[in-house]
Amino acid sequence: MIDLHVHFPMRLLGGVESPRDVIKGMTRVRGREDGKLRAAVLAIAARLFNFRDWDGTWRVTPQLLEQGEVSIACSVLYRPFSEMDLDEPYGSPPESAYYPKLIELLEATEAEVARTGGVTVRTAADLDQPGQRYVHCIEGGFHLGATPEDVTANVHELADRGVLYITLAHLFWRRVAANTPALPFLPDAIYNLVFPQNKDAALSELGEAAVKAMYERKVLVDISHMRDDAIDETFALIEALDKETGRDPRAYPVIASHSGYRFGGQKYNLSDRTIVRIAVRGGVVGLIFAQHQINDGLRRTETKTLGESVAILARHIDAIGPQHVALGSDLDGFIKPTLGGIETAADLAPLAAALKSRYPAEADDILENNARRVIAARFA
């Protein structure tokens, strides 16, 4: 099984200089005086918005992934205090200092993977290594640099390090790509009022530089979190690059690593038009396990059981099409509450069994083959 979007590195954020468990190391962050405060804030946020209860712990560990029968984890690198830079006003452009911090987390993740006997994927051959495999992914274009030149150079380095995809937009506008509201505790209308974005800057100069560099090096563009106009501009740029290079569109898939079908009013989920454009390129939509997004337009109450959750996921699978759906759980991505019956990565095993029962002919595609198709295109 492949999880297209899982926050394995989140538990390492408490260790700025070295990988250490974030809960145990939260108050021992070194290097900056404000590090202790930021670590403490992250600890509280994890308990409020991520853990099942106050005394809970992380949902994704090597042991839990193994119990969940996840063979390939698309491991998402994200530095929350680069996005929510407390030293800068809202909507400020990225700073060059964010990129070294990203690399710091990447290297801490690789050390943790090696320590626990896993494999960090950097080449196509690594995908077929025995044991648990981890593929680097990045959430937030603000990590990539402060100038188009820096963004280009940094994307090239990330390609060399085996990064599968980059999600250019995220929770807050940082002048890279316009985003949609995604905070479960804040209605979309209130979010848009409190966190306004420039309506004329869907994809900025930094965003365009990122897409061009990613296209050149076959790092995939993840359109999750993007506002519809940013999605349109991203596809237009990629299609122009197809014409310029003569590349077959299916050789460069576009993905939405953690999203769903737009049944309701939330713009976070994908429109029919966007899903068709993803499908034409052979891309996939990873289904997010956040009740806030996945239930929108389908039910008003939370799912409580695995059976109820499978019924909801099936609505998305049928609407999108089983040949273009994967799992993109977003576990440990601050998505509390998660779907009923799915509390940790270990619960992916019973979910897989339920999907195999419901989709006997298509389950292997949903659980692995569709995601492997886009991963193979990246490393071809």
Task: Describe the predicted segments one by one.
Residues M1, A202-L203, S259:
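Exposed regions on extracellular, virion, or secretory-pathway luminal proteins
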